[in-house]
Amino acid sequence: MAAEIAAQPAPQDSPGEGELLDKIEALARLCTTLQGASQRVSAESGLARTRLGTALAEALLAREAAGADARALAMTGYRAVAAGHTRPRRYNRIARRIDNLLDRLPWIGRAMIIDRSGLWADERGKGRLGAMAAYARRGGDPSAQPQALFDQSWYLKGRPDLAGSAACPLTHYLLHGAAEGADPHPLFDTGFYAARNAAELGACGLSPLEHFVRVGAGEGRDPHPLFDVAYYVRQAPDLIATGENPLLHYLRTGAARGLNPHPLFASDYYASQLAASGIAEEASLLHYLTAGSALGLKPHPLFDPAWYREQYPDVVTRNAEPLIDFVTTGGEQGRSPGPWFDTSRYLALRAPAGPVVGNPLVDYLHGGAWRISEPWLGRPSLDFVSTAAEFAGWSMTPLEHWARQGGGQIPNA
């Protein structure tokens, strides 16, 4: 029986089944080939994207470097022209005694004090002293505004004892207010200027405002933490031709032209908030410092004053203005400007490219964005590469773009 079974022929595959097996094997080989090809293409694509990302980052870094060179050249040109307008003065005991004596005279004596200070902005000419005397006659009238970097109504809010009196606020500032650390204008920070120029002020004896108007502006010295002279001059070529005081230029025409006084103050962005709130447009930085900050308006897409106050309660306790705090000390202390930008994370990502000098957010805006592995601070590099070409034509970083668009989510959340 077993022999009979063994003698029987083995079953053969039907012709149809054999062809099917051949097709399955061929298909398996094809799948293996395609899988290998796909892996090679993916690797090559990843390498190409990496190279593209590197090339784009290098191009954008080069653009920022060119911008820095342009700012330096503009500042050199401005200083050369402004040097012809500087009016150094040494204010010693004798000069002070003369001013104190003049202050005892009626309005004409106070007009002479103003004239000697060099603060009156009008060019010298007939009627100049008369204009100063007419101003001095009005005493503490809040509506009286001298032709100087002095905001009378604003100064009187800090010195209500002078309002409506016969005292001349500008001469009061020159003889008393400056020494007490009072600010003559929202855009001139006496303490900030004095701290940064202590040696120069000690040598000449002038008040901070007098030094700035006579000498400091022409030398490129900043009058306020939020007014960067070098940054501003680059946007106003006419300053290089005239040598005009940059802060006076900003108040006269620059603000209306939408020029930015500081890297962290975007005038167009702020103006759009004023328009949306139905607020009459004025000098944006002036409005921000006198009202907008308290209202929670944002000076820049990446800085949120309300968020900053919530995160750092000492700012409220000290009655400090959030952006000023961030620019002067907060940024270097590791504080973040808003939910869009994590300072500690940025510094960690930025470290391999070298140390950050100055404010971290300013560093990010001036090229740091293109030095880190995650330009979005939380988005993968491939997302960056897919849209980075857009940024080649913009003077804007990825985070700024997202923040301006209102972003559906916080990138670094």
What do the PLM-derived regions correspond to, one by one?
Residues 2-5, 16-413:
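Charge-rich, low-complexity intrinsically disordered regions
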